[in-house]
């Protein structure tokens, strides 16, 4: 299995921070945001990762290099313009080939990594596996309609959501996704929408399974999200102290 990671776009909602730094390199708990996703993939046994970057911008490559320090091999894939997530998948086909792959939006942070989702995708036998999270405002996201252990429809930012689940920025596919992204048409905003690709799979008789995130998940698209992501990550860090304390003393606190 390979990995595909987004690190392009312009981060307009995070200005003025992103005037001088790619949003995927903004530190969360003193680590570039993008390195969390790489670490999740490496922990799940995914060692070959393609990173979508803005054409002509080498900031991500200068920061992440070959990936050797994280135990992965990075391939940089330029995208000329932000034409939608399905377009990201489309231009990555030469890198992915016939392999299954994990597609991860680089500005997403979650607790627990992705190994559970990889295992559940492999066990499901499905063509596509979406990772969902319950939210209070599903109309802001792609929203699935669920029947049993399968998804039967997906709608992007619906006015009347059919569930209280959001499709997060974590997706798993086999090679059938490439037929979908090469067949759909641009939306009204001129982008190839990933929800349309998922619906194409469903309409073509492909199976779409899902996992639910049981801990926290954060899309760090806004300044308030960055603050919350820092708080969540720091709250889950556990320090280590190898000092010895004699048996007549006691230590309290974290």
For each of these PLM feature ranges, what is it?
Residues 2-5, 13-16, 27, 31-105, ...:
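Conserved N-terminal catalytic core of the sugar/cofactor nucleotidyltransferase
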Residues 77-79, 131, 211-213:
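Conserved beta-strand termini and adjacent loop/short-helix elements that scaffold enzyme active sites
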Residues 110-188:
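Conserved core of the sugar-phosphate nucleotidyltransferase
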Residues 1, 150-153, 175-254:
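Left-handed beta-helix
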Residues 19-24:
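Short alpha-helical oligomerization interface
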Residues 9, 107, 134, 222:
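Active-site glycine-centered loops adjacent to acidic/histidine catalytic or metal-binding residues
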Residues 25, 144-146, 210:
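A structural signal for short hydrophobic beta-strand segments in well-ordered beta-sheet cores
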Residues 82-85, 137-138, 160, 217-218:
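A short acidic, often aromatic-flanked loop/helix-cap motif at beta-alpha or helix-coil junctions
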């Amino acid at each position: 299995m390979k990995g595909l990671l987004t690190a392009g776009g312009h981060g307009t909602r995070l200005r003025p921070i992103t005037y001088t730094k790619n949003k995927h390199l903004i530190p969360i708990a003193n680590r570039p945001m993008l390195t969390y996703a790489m670490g999740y993939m490496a922990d799940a046994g995914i060692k070959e990762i393609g990173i979508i970057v803005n054409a002509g911008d080498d900031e991500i490559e200068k920061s992440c290099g070959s990936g050797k320090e994280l135990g992965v091999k990075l391939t940089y894939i330029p995208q000329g313009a932000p034409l939608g997530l399905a377009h990201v998948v489309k231009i990555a086909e030469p890198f992915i080939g016939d392999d299954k792959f994990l597609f991860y939006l680089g500005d997403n942070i979650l607790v627990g990594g992705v190994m559970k989702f990889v295992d559940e995708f492999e066990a499901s036998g499905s063509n596509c596996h979406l990772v969902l999270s319950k939210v209070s405002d599903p109309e802001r996201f792609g929203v699935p309609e669920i029947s049993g252990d399968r998804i039967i429809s997906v709608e992007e930012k619906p006015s009347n959501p059919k569930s209280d689940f959001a499709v997060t920025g974590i997706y798993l596919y086999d090679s059938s996704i490439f037929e979908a992204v090469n067949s759909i048409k641009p939306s009204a905003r001129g982008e190839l929408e990933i929800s349309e690709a998922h619906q194409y799979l469903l309409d073509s008789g492909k199976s779409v399974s899902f996992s639910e995130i049981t801990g926290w998940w954060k899309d760090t698209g806004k300044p308030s999200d960055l603050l919350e992501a820092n708080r969540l990550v720091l709250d889950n860090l556990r320090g280590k102290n190898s000092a010895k304390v004699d048996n007549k003393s006691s230590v309290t606190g974290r």
